[in-house]
């Protein structure tokens, strides 16, 4: 062999079918058999003053068998591309005749046999098209407001998820590390207490609190790593309410969140409309937590919200993730106060800000200090510290290694208590503004000031932004400069004024006043004309509805809807 030849190693392997793993069909759980078993399921008392590992062991000893019991009596389905919901017995007969005629035409290549094979083929595929249209039409006739979006997904198809392409990360393991370091900043972990002791002033957990928490849980929420939905826990609690009560009650009294409930899956999704996807900031992570952990989080969230309102830790202009305060309330408050400031013929200007990666920057020690200084009961502060500490997350994307990684900082966005913890974390940012106001909705802030001129409002906004930035730096958070927007409100008498074009300098960048700003889903114009918002909302259905209706008509090519292969676990 000459030097021009290089030995090539070839490995032969069976093709990968990329079959999806079986998943439980919780709508077909055998509750008749489980009813008797769950009624006799007994949970012993938790240790009185255990160490954290001892309580984790007790938690896993009784929760894991319960989860295994539920999965054992639940059917599993394996998605298959060979099972079609529109398939009929008549198509089976036509399929056999078609393949029989095709084989005969290949064996006896005569004009008569070729014509017979072509006729059989045309009839077979025509029957397939008719069966698809019939099934699609019946699916649309039975559509509900919720399943209509499912029909749209079938009609348009689902976009393939982007594979992260990050500089300096060539392997899935390197990409996993880069994404973890971007979203969950490395930090020294907090050490848990050596021994857990019951809090004397903590109210005992009641079945009413558990029922109220389960009522808040949505049946359409995606489950966490264990795959159990809220509907299953609701049925378990309905059969035997003592199970959830005896497992969750010690966790409240001992102010502890077990390690077995801190594991989560982080689904990496690309943000639509980004010019480039070579940066981790072009992606977002949706954290999926075990539903059992979220039940406890709902209970603590209700107690924490009541304590925060009692201690006046939440500012009156703080909206978002609070009952009864929606985006409509925030926008209505902003509009009403702007008109009030304009009555003395003052110029009014707002600056819209957005906190960068707000949930990912929540520091455990800082939050505990804010809650303690705000008068929150000690058992809620301790439970919050335990909830945020020593978590783990397994990133899910194409080619992900699937290894859990420790998460030291940040609040998981998939938990019902995380929005409230974030609101309390940024509560020190709110301060009183003379002749102005500050309104916030989760991580969106609006600074509005009034002055005799627009130049005066710009100077006031710059001073207030520096003050707000100093407060934010103490919390370890910052504002996204790219999402900053400025607008100057105008009254009808100021419509033809040429002095409202004053711009503002923020961190070395110049922001000119916009003719329209979209904040919290509402469109604002300098004249506060509501027609600017409603005209856009009315225009969108007129543009997108015809294409959507055309795509779901039965006469069109029906999208493939795959059924499942049912098997008992």
Task: Please annotate each region the language model reported.
Residues 1-81, 173-177, 530-548:
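Surface polyanion/phosphate-binding segment centered on an Asp-His-Pro turn
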Residues 12-17, 26, 59-62, 73-77, ...:
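Basic/polar low-complexity segments
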Residues 77-79, 84-89, 126-127, 135-142, ...:
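Non-catalytic, peripheral interaction segments enriched in hydrophobic/basic residues
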Residues 200-412:
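Conserved pre-catalytic core of RNA-dependent polymerases
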Residues 357-374, 445-470, 528:
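Catalytic palm subdomain of template-directed nucleic-acid polymerases
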